[in-house]
């Protein structure tokens, strides 16, 4: 009886761990998001060649977030990070209308990978503070998210520099990864 109670208690209150892969085109704001979540402040970034990885503690959950560079020459390396990924954060520069089709193509190419079949998808429609930014509905349309029938997905408007929307995204991830496990 005591052992059963101990197992139940630890399941309810133990820190959960989640492996998150954050990708998107270059200059979408991935590294800014990562360090805003980790440190609570804006850091000066340079283009990521390779990856940054940080553990973000939030609401009794330990998110291990892999931020992988988005330049076209290094996107083929994304697949090396797919294994054991529970949640995929795809960051889009909502102000970059010229490259939203490129973003869509990269997103769908990734989602067709077998290793990501069970990962939930969170899209951060970033840079919402800019006056010409596309809203979440327009990004949903341009990325073809409604065509994702076999995928659990959500889009969250964000502003990496203020932190707006970031924790709402983590809330969605934590409840939706937890229900899938």
From Swiss-Prot:
A lipid is attached at residue 2 (N-myristoyl glycine). GTP binds at residues 24-31, 67-71, 126-129. GO terms for biological process: intracellular protein transport; vesicle-mediated transport. Pfam families: Arf. Keywords: ER-Golgi transport, Golgi apparatus, GTP-binding, Lipoprotein, Myristate, Nucleotide-binding, Protein transport, Transport. One of its GO terms (molecular function) is GTP binding. Gene3D superfamilies: P-loop containing nucleotide triphosphate hydrolases. PROSITE patterns: ARF. It is found in: Golgi apparatus. InterPro entries: Arf1-5-like, P-loop_NTPase, Small_GTP-bd, Small_GTPase_ARF, Small_GTPase_ARF/SAR. This is ADP-ribosylation factor. It comes from Zea mays (Maize). The lineage of its organism: Eukaryota, Viridiplantae, Streptophyta, Embryophyta, Tracheophyta. The gene is ARF1.
